[in-house]
A protein has these predicted regions:
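Short glycine-rich phosphate-binding loop at a beta-alpha junction
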Residues: 222, 470-483, 501-502
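Glycine-rich phosphate-binding loop plus the immediately following alpha-helix
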Residues: 256, 370-375, 441, 447-454, ...
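Hard-cation-handling environments
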Residues: 487, 549, 588-639
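Conserved phosphate-binding catalytic cores of ATP/NTP-utilizing and phosphoryl-transfer enzymes
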Residues: 266-271, 331, 353-362, 384-385, ...
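Glycine-rich phosphate-binding loop of actin/hexokinase-like ATP-binding domains
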Residues: 384-409, 525-581, 585, 625-628
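Internal gly/pro-rich beta-alpha loop/helix module
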Residues: 65, 169, 336-414
């Protein structure tokens, strides 16, 4: 028997995922002594003494059987002679020392686990019907964290001191809720209230059951959740969905739906093995699936009526679906007969989602009938992530947010020691910060042509800088376009910190992103076809659809689509008839073109006419996306 001492340093997603209790239980079962320590922003340290074979077994178990929601990026091991200083194995108090060169991996929000779902529906459970139940393996993380290390005082659960019973489990290393920072119960935790759109509190012995009844009756309800707020209504009838569209002034954009369970989803549509794996993962994103493949094959009444499906995703062959990921979702489906609920973000189109109860109720009273809101602060809002499979095997992000943020991407190259902020483009923006060879992306922000979204971007970036312990970044980058609000925002940050500002050509940014995503070595050059829309070119002209040759640092434009003359500037991006006129105006007889366009609009209340066709101004813009839209528009007009 050979006794040894081992010091193990583990980095990755090892905080807020039950990693320390896991190590504690294994070490105790192997009769090892020592400790496991949360290093705050630098991973977890494990120091153990005991038989060498038992220590090897501990390391093997950590590598191969750690909690499913954890992720080990590095495991460094140092052997030494035992010092016989430990009587037992303990979980030590987290370190509060911040290391400027540390590589923190911050935990995303995690869907409710099966054990907590059982607690939710088991009558003898202390958490029976409690809509905020969680444990060390599940529940909100990123949306509640205010600082590191990830301990309860550094979350919004600071507002809810634990009762004696909850504290007993919280301090017991063998309990599933040991150091579960968001744990609580009916007696000590957050609570919901139900209010109508006139501000009247709805009294009920079970307000969640009452909310489900209201939805069954066709009501539209705002429901505050883990990291944001949804507007919900039923799917068994298309009328409430059409009412929601009318009130939200969202005539065509699709809604997402939350399906009761996996078996119900499989009655609605066919999903492959990978789609099922993603849908049921602890990340629980929205997945775009075929809208009709299930119903077309069913000889029985479809799970969701065809009229409702068309109202949910008008004119589309796919639909965004997700499964319940929070306790409140399971409780709502427990009390409703609906197979699915429409869930759309609680915000006006193009604006950040509302997360404060009073703002939710003030701003949405003309859209919703009732509000189900709670008193736990959401420190960082995050929309539902959206994933789509390409070729049935390759999942790609349409939107990266809840469940994935703030996990970093690896980034190798001579710049990996630099701390750089990226503020993103104008459309579908996401901020990012590089540190220690990682790129930490913020949650999805949206279009930054609104000042409210710039404020959201600023808040998200500042929060990430704080968590990463970056007091002064080395540089900041923005889009080359001089008139974007995000460009102005970057200029202000550069001036505030007195750091360089780098203006990046939009399509070169796409090229560099492909290299990062593919882990292509930094000294490589690639040929990249950017089948993208408008980008401000290095020659101060509009670019779109380039063939670029380049690397991380720069690129050369070797070719691209022929410049097309689009009418009315940015209105061509809204009214396809304008761009079609720009392309075909000099190539087609006027009468034939007018016949093709029919009653198409070129402005909110203006249809195409011969006179208008004669006077439309032409503004040059090269844009591959508009060209594809024009082709689609012609195909639509000809059918």
């Amino acid at each position: 028997m050979v006794n040894k001492r081992a010091t193990i340093h583990v980095t990755g997603i090892v905080q807020g995922v039950g990693f320390r209790p896991f190590v504690y239980r294994i070490a105790k079962s192997l009769s090892l002594s020592g400790y496991v320590l949360n290093l705050g922003d630098a991973g977890v340290e494990i120091t153990v003494e005991g038989e060498e074979t038992q220590i090897q077994e501990l390391i093997h178990t950590i590598r191969n059987n750690s909690p499913s929601i954890s992720r080990i990026d590095t495991l460094d091991l140092e052997w030494s002679d035992p010092q016989d200083e430990f009587e037992e194995f303990q979980i030590q108090k987290s370190s509060t020392i911040r290391n400027e060169d540390a590589i923190p991996v911050l935990p995303p929000d995690i869907a409710i686990c099966k054990d907590c779902v059982n607690d939710l529906i088991r009558k003898r459970s202390r958490w029976y019907l409690y809509p905020f139940t969680s444990c060390a393996a599940c529940g909100p993380r990123f949306s509640t964290i205010t600082d590191l290390p990830y301990d309860r005082p550094n979350t919004t659960m600071l507002d809810f001191p634990l009762c004696d019973t909850c504290n007993t489990g919280y301090t017991n290393p063998l309990d599933r809720r040991y150091h579960a920072q968001t744990t609580a119960c009916h007696d000590c935790g957050p609570a919901y209230r139900l209010v109508d759109n006139k501000g009247t509190m709805i009294a009920s012995t079970n307000i969640i059951e009452r909310t489900a009844q209201l939805i069954d009756e066709g009501a539209i309800v705002a429901i505050q959740g883990i990291s944001g707020t949804h507007i919900a209504t039923k799917t068994s009838s298309h009328e409430p969905i059409e009412t929601l569209r009318l009130r939200k002034k969202r005539s065509h954009r699709p809604f997402a739906i939350m399906i009761r369970d996996l078996s119900t989803l499989k009655q609605l549509t066919h999903i492959n093995e990978l789609e099922e794996k993603i849908l049921t993962s602890w990340r629980r994103p929205i997945v775009l699936v075929s809208k009709n493949s299930g119903n077309l094959k069913n000889a029985v009444l479809p799970v969701i009526p065809a009229e409702s499906l068309e109202s949910i995703a008008p004119g589309l062959d796919s639909i965004g679906v997700m499964l319940p990921y929070a306790p409140i979702h399971h409780l709502l489906f427990r009390n409703t007969n609906e197979p699915a609920l429409v869930l759309t973000s609680a915000n006006p189109t193009g604006m950040p989602m509302y997360i404060e109860p009073e703002i939710i109720m003030n701003e949405l009273r003309d859209i919703v009938d009732y509000f189900l809101v709670h008193n736990r602060r959401i420190h960082q809002r995050a929309d539902d992530s959206v994933v789509k499979l390409i070729d049935k095997t390759n999942p790609v992000f349409i939107r990266r947010a809840r469940g994935y943020v703030p996990e970093p991407l690896l980034f190798n190259g001579p710049w990996e020691t630099l701390k750089v902020i990226g503020v993103g483009p104008e459309e579908k923006a996401t901020g990012s910060i590089s540190k220690s060879g990682r790129i930490y992306m913020t949650q999805h922000i949206g279009d930054t042509n609104q000042i409210e979204n710039i404020e959201f971007l600023s808040d998200a970036i500042n929060h990430m800088l704080h968590l990463l312990d970056i007091n002064k970044p080395d540089a900041i980058s923005c889009d080359l376009h001089p008139e974007f609000l995000s460009t102005d925002f970057a200029e202000r940050i550069a001036a505030e910190y007195e750091i360089p500002l780098y203006r990046i050509q939009h399509h070169h940014a796409h090229l560099a992103t492909i290299m990062v995503d593919g882990l292509i070595p930094y000294d490589s050059r690639i040929i990249c076809i950017t089948a993208d829309g408008f980008g401000y070119g290095s020659d101060n002209n509009a670019w779109g659809g380039e063939i670029l040759v380049g690397d991380y640092s720069d690129s050369i434009r070797r070719g691209g689509l022929k410049v097309q003359e689009y009418t009315g500037g940015d209105l061509s991006a809204i009214y396809a008839a304008r761009s079609l006129i720009g392309i075909l105006g000099n190539r087609m007889d006027k009468k034939r073109l007018l016949h093709l366009l029919g009653s198409s609009r070129i402005a909110p209340d203006t249809e195409v006419s011969e006179k208008i066709l004669d006077v439309l101004l032409h503004a040059k813009r090269q844009n591959v996306n508009k060209l594809l839209e024009d082709l689609a528009y012609i195909m639509y007009m000809c059918t």
